[in-house]
């Protein structure tokens, strides 16, 4: 059995860290892991349980019922009253299953603090293919054909921006990711970085290769401490596995990455 605790900011605010600590201390019958936000913040804390290949999702798991919840899992009382009352409702499951996720495909699925989980989900394959098989110009053309555009009001074409950066004069070029969100209640960037930081790193490296940059910077809000912690860990893991730094994947392309935390706002 594997127990996975949803530990995005929303889950932690609802008590997920206490749930993880309880299972870490009292549970010996299951493997324990974490994941990010799957997008149903209103149902946190969320606990996924995988048993014999079947995944069950339990919602609003309060810290006050942890002893009973843990005992029911240990005894595999999946059809019992307690577990059935906490299981994800069909209408919520339908809400998820109708979605086609691209940038969010791994969020709430993999462990955001594990590069092994990301690689197992197909991570860094696109980067390796780009570095092995494509020129920077071919990458930009592929982005042009895809129709990828900025998510701001202007919908600015990504290929145009990358192409302009590549053709601009200067030996030293930088790729900057703006993960600062000033709109009240907005946390799209936070959700991605907290739940799938290696996805951001891989995308930035492909962009850096396309424009000829040897350094990438992520500007993150100081109010996103968990995002900063997980991205810092992901950068270190990518460096250790050879996906960041000198001669990435033996391609001759080199790029380093760093985080710049914002000064905070009021």
Predicted segments with their positions:
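Feature of Fe-S/electron-transfer and energy-metabolism proteins
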Residues: 1-266
């Amino acid at each position: 059995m594997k127990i996975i605790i949803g530990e995005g900011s929303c889950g932690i605010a609802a008590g997920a860290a206490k749930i993880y600590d309880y299972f870490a201390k009292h549970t010996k019958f299951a493997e324990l892991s974490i994941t990010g936000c799957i997008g149903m913040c209103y149902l946190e804390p969320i606990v996924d349980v995988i048993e014999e290949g079947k995944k069950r999702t339990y919602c609003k798991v309060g810290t006050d019922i942890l002893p009973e919840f843990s005992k029911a899992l240990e005894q595999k009382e999946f059809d019992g009253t307690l577990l059935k009352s906490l299981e994800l409702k069909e209408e919520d499951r339908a809400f998820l299953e109708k979605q086609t996720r691209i940038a969010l495909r791994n969020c709430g699925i993999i462990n955001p603090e594990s590069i092994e989980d990301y690689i197992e989900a197909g991570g860094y394959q696109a980067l390796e293919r780009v570095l092995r098989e494509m020129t920077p110009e071919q990458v930009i053309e592929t982005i042009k054909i895809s129709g990828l555009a900025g998510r701001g009001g202007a919908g600015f074409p990504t290929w145009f921006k990358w192409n302009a950066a590549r053709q601009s004069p200067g030996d030293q070029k930088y790729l900057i990711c703006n993960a600062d969100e000033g709109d009240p209640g907005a946390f799209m960037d936070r959700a991605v970085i907290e739940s799938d930081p290696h996805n951001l790193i891989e995308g930035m490296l492909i962009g850096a290769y396309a424009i000829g940059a040897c350094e990438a910077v992520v500007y993150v809000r100081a109010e996103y401490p968990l995002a900063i912690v997980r991205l810092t860990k992901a950068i270190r893991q990518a460096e250790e596995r050879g996906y960041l730094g000198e001669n990435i994947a033996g391609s001759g392309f080199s790029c380093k990455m760093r985080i710049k935390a914002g000064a905070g706002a009021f």
